[in-house]
């Protein structure tokens, strides 16, 4: 796809260029957090519905050994960004690293744990890659959006449907991000 703007041809990113279900594999003190394994499991379910792969993104310093553990739990691929600046969690270096991975590899879905770190990292990253983020999801599934399309309304298929509590937990909302990639969520 190309966009012609004032005589210049600008490459326009098509949604079909985004592939795979990615998870941020949180580690603290070079030990993987439980949420990393939980996200790999959920990502495997979503990836099966989309006929794609699960990629774990591991950020830190001297963390390469943890990649094997993620593979044993079901990640098809592990991208390791190993840098002394990532020894302990700080928003800016971690956000820069995750944004660069997203920009290079173009995941269709990016899941982050709804931990203190994930609640800081997720919104920062989603803003920088210009996509939405659904926070504190309790259910994720692949489906059509809008769920109950009106006659004549276009329905998009294979969307990430993200369910979360709304209005103080009195109701639930199912949210989709049909026009932007990656589809991002923090997951409880």
Segments (PLM) and residue ranges:
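N-terminal glycine-rich FAD/FM-binding segment characteristic of electron-transfer flavoproteins
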Residues: 1-188
